[in-house]
């Protein structure tokens, strides 16, 4: 092959002859998502295409007046194997054309904050522990948060003291959600414009 394009053309033509289309329905299994094991051993939750797409549609209705399609810059600091991050950061924000900034090691606070300073992010998702970690950084507290539209807390309860410090530092409320792996994951979430309670 002279280049990658030639290889891809050959591969696509070969696949057209050898592969047949697979018919899927909304009730077909999309993935097995493992739970966090907070109440015992980790279990595989069966999630269908309909489960995941329903959650994405619910998210779309929830945030539609707060976002601009294709213009959001989202901080993805939670692991994508966690259902909260997988659904919200990857599936939803990718679906609407957002730019996801993947933080591969959020425990490396110095580099995490350095990355946050580099991008004018509009959304961040985190757990209480991560919000607290960021608030310990004097460099983080000096970031310009003018573009930050909302912060979503999930995966564990966000403490009121954390939410108050976050609001004071960023000018942005933490919007708390609740869910389970088995529900792919969102069950309920507060309104973005509401004060934390």
Question: For each predicted feature, which ranges?
Answer:
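Gly/Ser/Thr-rich phosphate-binding loop
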Residues: 98, 121-126, 135-197
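Conserved adenylate-forming
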Residues: 14-27, 32-76, 98
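Glycine- and other small-residue-rich loops at beta-strand/loop junctions that grip anionic moieties
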Residues: 21-24, 45, 78-79, 101-105, ...
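Conserved AMP-binding/adenylation subdomain of ANL enzymes
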Residues: 53-73, 83-123, 137
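Alpha-helix N-cap/helix-start capping motif
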Residues: 29, 106, 128-129, 156, ...
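Structural core segment of the AMP-binding/adenylate-forming
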Residues: 1-10
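Conserved S/T- and glycine-rich ATP-binding loop of Class I adenylate-forming
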Residues: 29, 35-38, 74, 80, ...
């Amino acid at each position: 092959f002279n280049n990658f394009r030639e290889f891809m053309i050959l591969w696509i033509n070969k696949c057209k002859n050898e592969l047949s289309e697979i018919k899927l329905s909304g009730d077909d299994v999309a993935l097995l998502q493992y739970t966090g094991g907070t109440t015992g051993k980790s279990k595989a939750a069966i999630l269908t295409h309909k489960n995941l797409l329903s959650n994405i549609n619910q998210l779309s209705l929830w945030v539609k007046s707060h976002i601009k399609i294709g213009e959001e810059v989202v901080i993805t600091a939670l692991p994508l194997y966690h259902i909260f991050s997988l659904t919200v950061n990857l599936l939803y924000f990718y679906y609407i054309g957002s730019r996801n900034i993947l933080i591969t090691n959020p425990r490396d606070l110095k580099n995490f904050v350095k990355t946050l300073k580099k991008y004018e992010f509009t959304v961040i998702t985190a757990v209480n522990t991560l919000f607290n970690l960021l608030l310990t950084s004097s460099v983080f507290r000096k970031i310009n948060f003018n573009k930050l539209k909302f912060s979503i807390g999930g995966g564990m309860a966000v403490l009121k003291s954390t939410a108050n410090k976050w609001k004071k530092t960023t000018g942005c409320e933490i919007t708390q959600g609740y869910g389970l792996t088995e529900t792919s994951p969102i069950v309920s979430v507060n309104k973005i414009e509401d004060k934390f309670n």
